[in-house]
Amino acid sequence: MEVVDPEDRDPDDMLLIDRIGDAVAGDAGNDSDSQEEQLEHQVLEQQLAHHQAHHPLRRDNRHVAMLLDAPLEPPPMGLFEGARAGGVAHPRPPARSKKRSFFTIVRPTVLRNQRPELCPLFLNASRAIGEVREEQRGEFFAEYLFENMTSENYPNGVGLPHHWGQL
């Protein structure tokens, strides 16, 4: 097979290829992508009309100009309705992924990994409270602590809470 340099080609050959393509496509020399270019042209006309309508605001205030020059949100629906009308449908732009807040990320806490430290007095009181009816639990807890928090049960305070973390 012979390799042909593009510069060595006859320019008339390219015209012949264009004419054959026109005959096959049936567009008689009109090489435009009709519906796609029409949609793009409509969008450009809308943007131009938008710019012309707000030109005095843009000229007077720089911040307003920045806001008005931002792309239209959401994009015009005419681009995506072509499939319903029998034309070429353009794919929708991908949706933005939601950014995850670090407040919602689950991390292991101290309470899940280890039990809070409790002194033996409160452990015994909580076990004893389980045997009492719910209406009497507060009163029973106070009585239990009063009776059992004595120097006989806890000589020299050994076993009693010595800092708030043990409660």
UniProtKB/Swiss-Prot annotation:
Glycans are attached at residues 30, 124, 148. This is Male-specific protein scotti. Post-meiotically transcribed gene that has a role in late spermiogenesis; required for actin cone progression during spermatid individualization. Keywords: Developmental protein, Differentiation, Glycoprotein, Spermatogenesis. Belongs to the male-specific scotti family. The keyword Transferase does not apply. It comes from Drosophila ananassae (Fruit fly). One of its GO terms (biological process) is sperm individualization.
